[in-house]
Design a protein with these regions (language model features):
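Acidic, surface-exposed loops and disordered segments
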Residues: 1-293
Length: 293
């Protein structure tokens, strides 16, 4: 609808940052365009003189799909990474640190004449998950090399799985994940609670999973919730995911050396940087997290 398109365009309005003008609200706006599990946007922001702290909003946690909050803390890392690139457009260097005392991510901001906006900053408003079949175009070697590099951070590396055999192995894991999740009533209820079945609901909440990203038609919420009980099955979801994976250029797996909150934040930063680089290449991406969930 025009109303939905106007709302989406407003949220994703390209920034007008200027070097020498510090605009904390614009930094936060760009941070909120980051990835988050079920698009829950589980963050709060505290503005201070020379820093912005990104804090977890546990009222938006997903206890069934994310019982240890690892996705939530990865989401904080994604938001921090966006803020780093937005800060550069304002002539600010950004030093990101995890604060275990309050489980927050502190972004320290300093004037730096050497930093400038990059094409990753421009990609922030373009990046989004696209959960439909892709066109099958292969990535060329320079793109692959840059994507792998974009997904590397201290103690985090990216593995690119590109062959048909590797895709089939991933499909097997995803299929088993779908079976475990979609036969779990608590998982289904939690997932459905975050789906926005029509533009009006998406505009009203400003969060959640829009049916548009997976090519679903807009339906009244009461009707869609009744229909989804019939159509959201392990077999159907497995077929959709298999089609999407086979049509893709490949699957990226982000591997962290450690498994704690600080490491989850770093993994989120690595993923977001990767996704921004992909968006700068006009490459579409989506999560396929069932195997780790």
């Amino acid at each position: 609808t025009d109303e939905y398109d106007n709302a989406a365009s407003g949220i994703r309005q390209p920034g007008a940052e200027q070097v020498g003008v510090v605009d904390a609200r614009e930094l936060i706006r760009h941070a909120t365009l980051a990835s988050s599990s079920h698009n829950t946007q589980p963050w709060k922001f505290r503005i201070q003189q020379d820093s912005i702290t990104i804090l977890p909003d546990f009222s938006r946690r997903c206890p069934t799909v994310d019982p240890d909050d690892s996705h939530l803390f990865k989401s904080l890392g994604c938001a921090a990474e966006n803020m780093v690139h937005a800060a550069a457009a304002q002539g600010l260097s950004a030093d990101v640190r995890f604060d275990p005392g309050e489980d927050g991510v502190i972004v320290l901001l300093n004037r730096d004449a050497s930093v400038r906006a990059t094409n990753l900053y421009q990609a922030i408003t373009k990046r989004q998950c696209v959960k439909t079949a892709y066109d099958g175009t292969s990535l060329v070697a320079p793109e692959l090399e840059m994507l792998e590099k974009a997904g590397e951070r201290q103690n985090v590396r990216t593995i690119m799985l590109l062959s048909e055999a590797q895709k089939d192995a991933i499909i097997d894991y995803v299929t088993r994940g779908n079976l475990a999740q979609l036969t779990d009533r608590a998982f289904r209820d939690e997932l459905v609670s975050w789906i926005r079945f029509n533009p009006s609901e998406a505009i009203r909440t400003g969060d959640g999973l829009s049916g548009r990203t997976s090519g679903q038609p807009a339906l009244p919420t009461w009707l869609a919730k009744w229909i989804i009980r019939l159509v959201l099955t392990p077999k159907g979801q497995a077929e959709t995911d298999a089609k999407n994976i086979r049509s893709s250029a490949g699957v990226a797996v982000f591997v962290s050396r450690h498994n704690d909150k600080a490491a989850w934040v770093e993994a989120g930063r690595a993923y977001e940087n990767f996704a921004l680089r992909a968006a700068s290449f006009n490459v579409r991406t989506a999560f396929i997290n069932q195997p780790i969930e």
